[in-house]
């Protein structure tokens, strides 16, 4: 995940 995004769930 990133600071405010979780593309992997």
Curated annotation (Swiss-Prot):
One of its GO terms (cellular component) is extracellular region. Coiled coil: none annotated. InterPro entries: Neurohypophysial_hormone_CS (IPR022423). Keywords: Amidation, Disulfide bond, Hormone, Secreted. Pfam families: Hormone_4. Disulfide bonds join 1-6. It is found in: Secreted. The modification Glycine amide is found at residue 9. GO terms for molecular function: neurohypophyseal hormone activity. It comes from the Eukaryota. Belongs to the vasopressin/oxytocin family. This is Aspartocin. It comes from Squalus acanthias. The lineage of its organism: Eukaryota, Metazoa, Chordata, Craniata, Vertebrata.
